[in-house]
């Protein structure tokens, strides 16, 4: 394969994840990534772009996002404003067409990585509305009677937090991979990527406390990898006595963001 992803210096990818990325690229299909928050779904696209030396274009999906937003926007208000004030060139509609993120990816002179982030935040029709464009790698702008065709097929990575079920027709067109939460061995590798040097005792105690919290079924919002990184950084900066880490879990608010979860863990520690 021309492009092969083998991870990057800033991203620890499992062999299964690397295979999924490479298969999606070889088959020229979007890669749909699911996993709980903090498992590195968004960072994967950054890592692929970095490893392959390609530009990254990010389309962050919101609840109000429509598929049309990713193609282009016709600024009819600006055109009307210009026409009222006699601005020259108002008849050139192309001046008022702004490409969206998908349009940018199609128009790029070199292949890019396109991240469609948190696709499930939009309404249920959003993924289906993208099927034609992602299949055919083109779209039509009726205002200018122009067809935008991809100069180079982008590497498309789509993330989902599983807030909504995605349409079957959309799923059939994707390569799917679920990122499992890292086990302790893989998590240790991830932590070492973020720190040039970390005290071994501090790391061992922090990992022990972190996975203990995650093992408590009644904790509703379990801490993620990014919160563990922040917590270890806080422990280092304050020079906390490492013997306190598993007994008290200092700065617990870095790990847990719900009062109920903090109370649950603190009750367990007092037993």
What residue ranges belong to the model's regions?
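C-terminal regulatory/interaction module of P-loop NTP-utilizing enzymes
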Residues: 1-271
């Amino acid at each position: 394969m021309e492009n092969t992803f083998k991870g990057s210096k800033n991203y620890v990818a499992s062999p299964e994840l690397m295979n999924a990325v490479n298969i999606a690229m070889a088959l020229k299909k979007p890669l749909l990534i699911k996993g709980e928050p903090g498992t590195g779904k968004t960072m994967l696209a950054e890592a692929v772009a970095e490893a392959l030396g390609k530009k990254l274009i990010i389309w962050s999906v919101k609840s109000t996002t429509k598929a049309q937003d990713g193609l282009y926007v016709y600024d009819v208000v600006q055109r009307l404003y210009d026409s009222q004030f006699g601005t020259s060139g108002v008849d050139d509609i192309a001046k008022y067409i702004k490409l969206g993120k998908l349009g940018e990816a199609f128009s790029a002179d070199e292949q890019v990585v396109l991240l469609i982030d948190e696709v499930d935040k939009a309404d249920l029709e959003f993924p289906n509305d993208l099927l034609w464009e992602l299949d055919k790698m083109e779209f039509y702008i009726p205002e200018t009677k122009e067809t935008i065709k991809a100069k180079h097929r982008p590497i498309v990575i789509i993330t989902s937090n599983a807030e909504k079920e995605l349409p079957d027709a959309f799923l059939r067109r994707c390569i799917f991979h679920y990122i499992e939460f890292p086990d302790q061995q893989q998590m240790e590798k991830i932590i070492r990527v973020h720190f040039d040097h970390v005290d071994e005792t501090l790391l061992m105690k922090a990992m022990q406390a972190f996975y203990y919290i995650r093992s408590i079924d009644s904790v509703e919002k379990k801490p993620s990898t990014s919160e563990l990184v922040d917590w270890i950084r806080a422990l280092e900066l304050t020079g906390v006595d490492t013997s306190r880490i598993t007994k008290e879990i200092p700065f617990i608010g870095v790990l847990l963001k719900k009062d109920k979860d903090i109370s649950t863990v603190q009750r367990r520690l007092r037993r």
